[in-house]
């Protein structure tokens, strides 16, 4: 019975503050919309896929060759991000992007037990993301045989005007802003109730003062 009473009391508190519950999420939504469309910069990601195989010798078995390539994938990913590759890419862009900037744009990943490396570049310009990721992949494919014992570096897929917008994600930002607004409104409502020590109901007299109710005066 007490749980039911507490729930009713809780709902009454929320109902009493319904304006705040509606206004604060609306304000957060407007602010988020403004930030998303007018402040937050767009980001575009373009990707390529690269396959690297080790050099074969007459004594190597195909399985051993694949296993060796798999074990070397982590090394290849680090080489792609190394100054040896990125310095050259920076020079080919006539210094438009520094090595540090290129490294900040770059993400290199691979699936477990796969020889395929995915190279991704994220910038604020769709075409530049395409150009940079393609150039990094080409430099890596050209220089890799000189760095390690590989003779077959294949660019499986290049970026051709296929950069994808990755941020800001409008729907996610708007949903989050509404949730934040509701949470803030509820916190403010209950904080206000906790700090309000006024006695407003008969139940408050019994719970806060510990006194029995002898009678009540009706409102006219």
Swiss-Prot record:
Sorted alphabetically, the Gene Ontology cellular component annotations on this record are:
plasma membrane
| Residue spans crossing the bilayer | 20-40, 171-191
Pathway involvement? Capsule biogenesis; capsule polysaccharide biosynthesis
Give the source's domain of life in one word: Bacteria
For the keyword Hydrolase, the answer is no
- Tell me where in or outside the cell this protein is found: Cell membrane
Q: How does it sit in the membrane?
A: Multi-pass membrane protein
One GO molecular-function entry: protein tyrosine kinase activity
Family matches, as Pfam families: Wzz
Determine if Iron-sulfur is one of this entry's keywords: no
Which biological process terms from the Gene Ontology are attached to this UniProt entry?
Answer: capsule polysaccharide biosynthetic process
Q: Keywords for this entry?
A: Capsule biogenesis/degradation, Cell membrane, Exopolysaccharide synthesis, Membrane, Transmembrane, Transmembrane helix
| Family listed | Belongs to the CpsC/CapA family.
Q: So what does this one do?
A: Required for the biosynthesis of type 1 capsular polysaccharide.
Q: What is this protein called?
A: Capsular polysaccharide biosynthesis protein CapA
Q: Which organism is it from?
A: Staphylococcus aureus (strain Mu50 / ATCC 700699)
Phylogenetic lineage: Bacteria, Bacillati, Bacillota, Bacilli, Bacillales
């Amino acid at each position: 019975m007490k749980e039911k009473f507490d729930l009713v009391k809780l709902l009454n508190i929320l109902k009493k503050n319904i304006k705040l519950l509606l206004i604060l999420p609306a304000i957060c939504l407007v602010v988020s919309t403004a930030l998303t469309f007018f402040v937050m910069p767009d980001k575009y990601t373009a990707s390529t896929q690269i396959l690297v195989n080790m050099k074969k010798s007459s004594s190597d078995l195909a399985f051993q060759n694949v296993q060796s390539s798999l074990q070397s994938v982590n090394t290849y990913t680090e080489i792609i991000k190394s100054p040896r590759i990125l310095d050259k890419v920076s020079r080919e862009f006539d210094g438009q992007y520094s090595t540090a900037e290129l490294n900040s744009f770059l993400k290199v990943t691979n699936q477990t037990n796969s020889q395929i490396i995915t190279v991704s570049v994220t910038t604020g310009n769709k075409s530049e993301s395409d150009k940079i990721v393609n150039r990094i992949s080409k430099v890596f494919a050209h220089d890799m045989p000189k760095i390690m014992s590989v003779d077959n570096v294949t660019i499986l897929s290049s970026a051709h005007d296929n950069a994808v917008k990755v941020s800001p994600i409008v729907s996610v930002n708007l949903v989050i802003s509404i949730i934040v607004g509701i949470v803030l409104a509820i916190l403010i409502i209950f904080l206000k109730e906790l700090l309000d020590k006024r006695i407003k109901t008969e139940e408050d007299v019994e719970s806060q003062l510990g006194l029995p109710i002898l009678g009540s005066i009706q409102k006219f």
